[in-house]
Amino acid sequence: TRHEQSAAFMAESYGKLTGKLSCCLSTLGPGATNLLTGVADANMDHSPVLVLTGQGSSNRLHKESHQIMDVCNMFESVTKWTTSIRNPSTIPERIGKTRSCSHRFARRHC
């Protein structure tokens, strides 16, 4: 899409209409903040959405650095579960937990 907010709303709509896990992604910083409204809507509608955002290198976290922010903290109040992946070997486990959460909390509206 041309804008992350559109991606979040499209993922929310797909999840809401099908009950299947959908996904949206963004770059770090402003890209992640642009997802926030659509993700909050998905959470309120119990739509299963996996949200992936970029992040700067771990040595830049918790410092004043261009476009670095605490994305997990920002999304915590509008998601069922949030995590940060710092080691690629944990990706399968984290995706598995995401799928488990999506099945528990999803409900069809249409």
Protein language model regions, located:
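N-terminal alpha/beta PP-like core and its mobile active-site loop of ThDP/TPP-dependent enzymes
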Residues: T1-C110
